[in-house]
Amino acid sequence: MQKIRRDDEIIVIAGKDKGKRGKVLKVLADDRLVVSGVNLIKRHSKPNPMLGVQGGIVEKEAPLHVSNVAIFNAETSKADRVGFKIEDGKKIRIFKSTQKPVDA
């Protein structure tokens, strides 16, 4: 079970976007995440009239390493760590500071 999953609210704790918050769009296999509005890069794209694609400078999210983010606890309004607990025979994720489930 992964500590950070798709649609989790996270906060960046290291790097150029430190302090920014966003929602996880995609979790990649090599411990990297794509987060909405964080780690934006600019890419130049050629126009393709056959596909109807207009050229120009496109801004998109680049992946960042999972060690540079922490899950955001809305109750405490701070970054938090994730732990696991077995409840009713199921393994659930909990916030370490409040011991409450993440997926509540």
From Swiss-Prot:
State any GO BP term from the record: translation
Do you know which Gene3D superfamilies this protein is assigned to?
A: 2.30.30.30
Q: Which GO terms describe its cellular component?
A: ribonucleoprotein complex; ribosome
Pfam families in the record, alphabetically? Answer: KOW, ribosomal_L24
Q: Which UniProt keywords apply?
A: Ribonucleoprotein, Ribosomal protein, RNA-binding, rRNA-binding
Could you describe the subunit structure of this protein?
Answer: Part of the 50S ribosomal subunit.
Family as reported in the entry's similarity comment = Belongs to the universal ribosomal protein uL24 family.
This one is known as: Large ribosomal subunit protein uL24
Native source organism of the sequence: Azotobacter vinelandii (strain DJ / ATCC BAA-1303)
Which taxonomic lineage is given here?
Bacteria, Pseudomonadati, Pseudomonadota, Gammaproteobacteria, Pseudomonadales
